[in-house]
């Protein structure tokens, strides 16, 4: 019985959809991370001002997965895909590098992996399913 309880806690902590907004709300202006989070927030506002499109695909297991595409002024060209980390918010994590690559003339795609942001999915699969998306 105890093993089932431990397994259930482990499952919920690792695989369930995270509550990112709650985590960001816990940072205080006195924390060492405050300056970094302020820079990320400013880059997020800046990237939102760029022309962009919301893209959506249907995964092999019928989940609607979304992303944001920022085309460069150069038509065509290379697209950089900025992938967020485990339990991260795609735009918050990718705005800073996305702006950097966009300023160099690249198209930028910021996808929301399954079970993150507006993409559907109840569980994070650590790449085992995402690799087919």
Residue locations for each model-derived region?
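Conserved alpha/beta-hydrolase
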Residues: 100-120
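An N-terminal hydrophobic leader/cap segment in hydrolases
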Residues: 1-57
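Short beta-strand element of the alpha/beta-hydrolase
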Residues: 77-85
């Amino acid at each position: 019985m105890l093993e089932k309880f431990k397994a259930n806690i482990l499952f919920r902590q690792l695989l369930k959809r995270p509550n990112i907004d709650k985590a960001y709300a816990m940072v205080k202006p006195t924390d060492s991370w405050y300056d970094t989070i302020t820079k990320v927030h400013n880059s997020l506002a800046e990237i939102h001002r760029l022309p962009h499109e919301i893209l959506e695909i249907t995964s092999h297991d019928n989940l609607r997965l979304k992303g944001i595409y920022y085309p460069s002024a150069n038509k065509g060209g290379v697209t950089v895909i900025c992938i967020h980390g485990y339990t991260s918010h795609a735009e918050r994590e990718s705005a800073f590098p996305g702006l950097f690559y966009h300023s160099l003339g690249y198209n930028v795609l910021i996808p929301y992996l399954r079970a993150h942001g507006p993409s559907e999915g109840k569980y994070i699969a650590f790449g085992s399913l995402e690799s087919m998306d």
